[in-house]
């Protein structure tokens, strides 16, 4: 039996559908009355751990899970050593730079030197501004980063944007996209090397069923 780390939240339903098409059914994890954090597939070939999206790479990297599904945004921010296996295509959103709508900033280089930029993704934000050679101070927030510009604490934010509704409702606009993030299938490198084809068969099954959906 191998172990899979499933992300709580927005990616969970599509993650469960992905494994179900590959023959591993963890649908009981969707039962809101079920408080369990571990689930066996109906076929008893695999076990799932229900964890926070940001913790998926940790469980996979440390070997507590052989496979996992996580957003590319989290994967890129974590910088943990995992095998990057498949782009699953769902959960799409942009990592974006946004400012107040009534500001004078229309592109990244308009931002004043050493200004404050609020973000949950501090490594991603820092790397982005370093590549642009723009000196800024990254302010780490774990909640609603939109409050940074609203309160005047920050000139801009770096955050995930799906529909743009939250930005619009808070008087913010995008001025740049850093990258497009989708759900990714990842694996533990050692588990992949020691695999007796159970993981490989699952990965190939996911890849083939995903291709059929895209067609």
From Swiss-Prot:
It is found in: Cytoplasm. Pathway: Amino-acid biosynthesis; L-histidine biosynthesis; L-histidine from 5-phospho-alpha-D-ribose 1-diphosphate: step 1/9. It is an enzyme of class 2 (transferase). This is ATP phosphoribosyltransferase. One of its GO terms (cellular component) is cytoplasm. GO terms for molecular function: ATP binding; ATP phosphoribosyltransferase activity. Heteromultimer composed of HisG and HisZ subunits. Its EC number is 2.4.2.17. It catalyses: 1-(5-phospho-beta-D-ribosyl)-ATP + diphosphate = 5-phospho-alpha-D-ribose 1-diphosphate + ATP. One of its GO terms (biological process) is L-histidine biosynthetic process. The keyword Glycosyltransferase applies. The keyword Cell inner membrane does not apply. CDD domains: PBP2_HisGs (cd13595). Belongs to the ATP phosphoribosyltransferase family. Short subfamily. SUPFAM superfamilies: Periplasmic binding protein-like II. It comes from Prochlorococcus marinus (strain MIT 9215). PANTHER family: ATP PHOSPHORIBOSYLTRANSFERASE (PTHR21403:SF8), ATP PHOSPHORIBOSYLTRANSFERASE ATP-PRTASE (PTHR21403).
């Amino acid at each position: 039996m191998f172990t899979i780390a499933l992300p709580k939240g927005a990616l969970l339903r599509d993650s469960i559908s992905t494994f179900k098409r590959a023959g591993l059914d963890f649908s009981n994890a969707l039962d809101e009355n079920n408080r369990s954090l571990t689930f066996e597939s109906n076929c008893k070939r695999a076990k799932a751990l229900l964890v926070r999206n940001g913790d998926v790479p940790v469980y996979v990297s440390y070997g507590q899970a052989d496979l996992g599904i996580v957003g590319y945004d989290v994967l890129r921010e974590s910088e943990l050593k995992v095998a990057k296996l498949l782009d699953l295509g769902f959960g799409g959103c942009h990592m974006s730079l946004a400012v107040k709508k009534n500001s004078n900033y229309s592109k990244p280089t308009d931002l004043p030197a050493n200004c404050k930029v609020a973000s949950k993704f501090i490594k991603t934000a820092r790397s982005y501004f370093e590549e642009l050679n723009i000196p800024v101070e990254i302010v780490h927030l774990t909640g609603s980063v939109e409050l940074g510009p609203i309160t005047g604490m920050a000139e801009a934010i770096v955050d995930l944007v799906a529909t743009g509704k939250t930005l619009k409702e808070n008087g913010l606009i995008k001025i740049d996209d850093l990258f497009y993030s989708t759900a990714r299938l990842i694996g533990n490198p050692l588990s992949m090397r020691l695999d007796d084809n159970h993981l490989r068969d699952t990965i190939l099954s996911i890849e083939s069923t995903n291709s059929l959906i895209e067609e």
